[in-house]
Amino acid sequence: MKTKVGFNRLDRKSSHRKALLRNMVISLFRHEKITSTKAKLSEVKRFAEKLITRAKVDSVHNRREVSKFIHDKYILNKLFTRISPIFKERKGGYTRVIKLGQRYGDAAEMAILELVDKTLEEKQ
């Protein structure tokens, strides 16, 4: 019997894990780059890719579905008006994980998660 198959639970209860992932996704869309442990970023990447794919088609339904996960109206608007148009022709792979090595204190594997295309400031 297989157990714990499907996703990384990050050693947290479900409500804490959801809040952590939501806050990290919002930070990614706000700053376009975040630094954390590799395990956290690989989970954040899953959610960010799904949200960007959903935001590529700007409809009322898609805005409501994305707003279930992103509660910040500024970030929601930024996702639909500034981030998703950059990725219109791209089929997937909107983010990249760059490994940084181990953290000094506890030897945790650190990484950077960033949006693939050039930053939004350079595009405008």
Curated annotation (Swiss-Prot):
Keyword annotations from UniProtKB, A to Z: Ribonucleoprotein, Ribosomal protein
Gene Ontology biological process terms, A to Z: translation
Gene Ontology terms for molecular function: structural constituent of ribosome
InterPro entries: Ribosomal_bL17 (IPR000456), Ribosomal_bL17_sf (IPR036373)
GO cellular component assignments: cytosolic large ribosomal subunit
One Pfam family per UniProt: Ribosomal_L17
Signal peptide: none
Subunit note: Part of the 50S ribosomal subunit. Contacts protein L32.
Classification via NCBIfam families: L17
Protein name in the entry: Large ribosomal subunit protein bL17
Species classification: Bacteria, Pseudomonadati, Spirochaetota, Spirochaetia, Spirochaetales
